Amino acid sequence: LPVKSLRESREKLEGVARNTKPWKSLLKFAPLDTRYPRPTAQDLALLLYTSGTTGAPKGVMLTHRNLEANARMGEEWIQPGNDEVIYSVLPLFHAYGMTLGLSISMICQARLVIFPTVDIDLMLKAMKKTMPTILPAVPPVYRRLLDEAKKRNISLQGIRYAVSGAMNLPHELV
């Protein structure tokens, strides 16, 4: 990995869980066995959980078509180029992180840089090597990022799209 602290974090991760197969070995068997039906656009792809802003968090059933439609919407908004870099600091188990991080990066064929947690220091170090062109985040992350970048005299001009969600974006951050 290009950033030392990311390399060190990866090295601290535990080894392969028992009874799992390495990803590369799974790729050899990519075609689905004919005994199993191929998933359709209407089939359940995953359960994502809401943040509970209107009550208790809920598990939302999303189909393959839902995921693709959300990613395609993002693609239409952003009109990606050939060299997009998306920083993913949002949890992938929520719709916002899944859609504007993981799903859109696949649709747009963008490079996806996933951060294990919101770590402004780590993000700014990574930006010295690879500036994101797309940064989906929440207002508190933008506030901290702007404050720290200003203190350290780091330009954020390479970010073409800073997509905000989950709460109101204060006018002073726009």
Locate each region found by the language model.
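Conserved S/T- and glycine-rich ATP-binding loop of Class I adenylate-forming
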Residues: 44, 50-53, 86, 92, ...
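Conserved G/P- and acidic residue-centered "switch" motifs that form tight phosphate/ATP-binding loops
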Residues: 53, 109, 166
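Conserved AMP-binding A3 loop
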Residues: 45-69
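Adenylate-forming
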Residues: 27, 90, 118-119, 132-174
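Phosphate-coordination loops involved in phosphoryl transfer and adenosine-cofactor binding
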Residues: 41, 82-83, 158-159
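Conserved AMP-binding/adenylation subdomain of ANL enzymes
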Residues: 68-85, 93-134, 144, 148-150
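Short beta-strand->loop structural element characteristic of the AMP-binding/adenylate-forming
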Residues: 1, 58-61, 88, 110-117
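ANL superfamily adenylate-forming
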Residues: 1-41, 149
